Curated annotation (Swiss-Prot):
The keyword Oxidoreductase applies. GO terms for molecular function: oxidoreductase activity, acting on paired donors, with incorporation or reduction of molecular oxygen. One of its GO terms (biological process) is tRNA modification. The lineage of its organism: Bacteria, Pseudomonadati, Pseudomonadota, Gammaproteobacteria, Thiotrichales. It is an enzyme of class 1 (oxidoreductase). Keywords: Oxidoreductase, tRNA processing. Residues 123-217 form the Rhodanese domain. The gene is trhO. This is tRNA uridine(34) hydroxylase. It comes from Francisella philomiragia subsp. philomiragia (strain ATCC 25017 / CCUG 19701 / FSC 153 / O#319-036). Belongs to the TrhO family. The active site is at 177 (cysteine persulfide intermediate). Its EC number is 1.14.-.-. InterPro entries: Rhodanese-like_dom, Rhodanese-like_dom_sf, TrhO, TRHO_N. Residues 310-330 are annotated as: Disordered.
Amino acid sequence: MSQIVVCAMYKFVTLEDYEAMRQPLLDTMIKNNVKGTLLLANEGINGTVAGSREGVNALLAYLKSDSRLADIDYKESYHQEMPFYRSKVKLKKEIVTLGIEEIDPNKVCGKYVEPKDWNALISDPETILVDTRNDYEIEIGTFKNAINPSTETFREFPEYVDKNLDPKKHKKVAMFCTGGIRCEKSTALMKAKGFDEVYHLKGGILKYLEEVPKEESMWEGECFVFDSRVAVNHDLEKGSYDQCFACRMPITEEDKKRPEYVKGISCHHCYDKVTEEQKARFAEREKQSQLAAERGFSHVGDDAKKLAKLNKQQKQQAKEIARKKAKSEI
């Protein structure tokens, strides 16, 4: 089986016609059997997709045919299975939600730092290194000596900056995230708040893992990704984590041995937060997922449509058999 290409991409660029771009972009994804989600907003494009080498190439070629996206930033990795179930293009106010409209990376942001130069920057004792990702992402991997802002969502990051960072005290700040988009917007926020020397890792963690040899790496752990792989290791291969269906938090094999873990229903992160009604709903979904798997289908996405069609056909056939049987007994 040929490997699936997983492509994370983004670009901050003014797209005044972003609403009109949606359907042609979705059509291109479907035509080339590329799955995943792309976000469009006035400020740009962001998302992660997956497909065959030919399919992803066709999508990138389509995007680059628009002069505004000719130099779109993207990172690739590979997986044995399709990590997404559907093809989606969504319209948003922001391609990454900070919640402050006046922050515009198209106007001002920090200085890009190439992966090969990143170690030198973060080894400088005068550099404050800040991980702009969420707490559950940082928990499974981050750079050595990086500060964890302990945020649950990116919207909380401005509050962290206001309470913990001072442009007069913190003269040199380096920031990073998974693919580069959050740290780029974060540096725009920092510049707006008066910080002068602000740097961000070009291409994010994924580009760093791709370009920096393991023996030179300052990365510790695995990198959380927003698809069914859950995390990738330094070789950009699927890591050792799974994901709780209920709360979407990453979990280890050891976590699965805990009494709070019930496959598809709860884990130690959410056991006391999930209602009985939710648990019952999750249990039914898990049951349907197992039945679908036994038939060689996925319970979600395009396979779900095929499964629903098959179930409908089987019900119709059963009704027809019952009708004929009843007729023969008359």
